[in-house]
Amino acid sequence: MNLALRAKISYILSHGLFWCTYCISWSYTACFLTSKGYNSFTVGLVTGLGAITSVILQPVTASLAGKIPFLNDKRNAIILKIISLVTAVLIMAGFPGSLSIAVLFTVLTAIDASIPSILSTLATSYINSGRYLNYGAARGCGSLTYSVFSLALGIMVSHAGTDILMILYIFFGVLCILAIAAFPANISETGNNSVSDNPVNPSGSRERTGFLARYPYLYSFFAASILLYIGHNIYNIFLINIVNRAGGDSVNLGTALAISACVELPVMAYFVRLENKIPVEKLMIISSIIFTLKAFSAIFATSVPAVYVVSFMQIGAFAIFTPGSVYFICKHLKPSDNSLGQALLGSCTLGLGGTLGNILGGFIIDRTGITAALVVAAILSAFGAILIAASMKTCMQPHKTT
């Protein structure tokens, strides 16, 4: 098998298998913990702490890869996945209702929220070494796998109970590690990820303030990413509430999720060709506008067909923004800064965006209902789109680019 084909297959498998484990640790958190005797407050606390911990964990792992020669993106992903497998085994051995399971599940969710940014860095480092890899296609396959596996998992849990979740997690986790290990070596794998022109202090650690000073437009870009993902997560996490408001049921929920996943795949798969025709900066602005239109449309989605239309709008929102943000970081940051840049992006989107979307959405829904939550999501998305436009304008100025 030639190098290019090996990279393509192993990277697609890495995403597909990883998102199967992510589906278990995040989408089925409430299902698993409530079956073990935990209440809704504890479930929310576990997912919230997991997301917050990932915000810290992602930059830390990126920084360690820049200081310790043995560590690189590939080994970081493998080490974290091994830790998650050990955690899953300990969860299986725990006692229902005990604090240990909640603590261990927090660790599990934190690790799985941290790995996507490492997988992104793995791809961009490979691309920066002068080789071709279609990140969007792999990420799109991950989205499709996530959707299909989520539906299949619901059927399996209904027949076998929640204990099957950790068994499946371990099974797919082992396969994920093998897929990542099969990914061919790149520049970063020969040693330190950051042996180039990245300033370090005497102890060898990166100065994050210096990092953001080199790329001032990242302040507004990361802030915009948080706002857009808060709106995105309010819609996704509480989609069942939107479907119920429209008079639908769990079948309609599954259909809405399937529509979102199906429209993501072709856009992500052909993102490289799309970027060749439209600059990534313009694509980011377009996606943020569609994010906002989708958020406002959700407010008025009071019928099941309308919910399906909103889900279809994923084609220009999340489907463009996800690969676009990764390629944007890769394009504008020096290769030595790429790992930290991708880690901070993950912290802002899956980390802070996910946490705040979950907490804020739940808080508003409990007090005033789903419509009010969607109004807030739309307003935040609009501010996010404005900040995206501002950051893109700044980064395209000749003296600001790298």
Locations of the language-model features?
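Helix-to-loop junctions at the C-terminal end of transmembrane segments
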Residues: 57-71, 157, 267-279, 365-366
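Helix-loop boundary and gating motifs at the non-cytosolic
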Residues: 2-51, 217-256
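Hydrophobic core of transmembrane alpha-helices in multi-pass small-molecule transporters
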Residues: 16, 98-116, 226, 306-320
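Structural signature of the two symmetry-related core transmembrane helices
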Residues: 75-90, 282-297
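Juxtamembrane intracellular "pre-TM" segments in multi-pass secondary transporters
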Residues: 1-5, 184-222
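A late C-terminal transmembrane helix in Major Facilitator Superfamily
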Residues: 339-367
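Cytoplasmic helix-loop-helix junction between adjacent transmembrane helices
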Residues: 108-141
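Symmetry-related core transmembrane helices of the 12-TM Major Facilitator Superfamily/SLC fold
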Residues: 165-182, 372-391
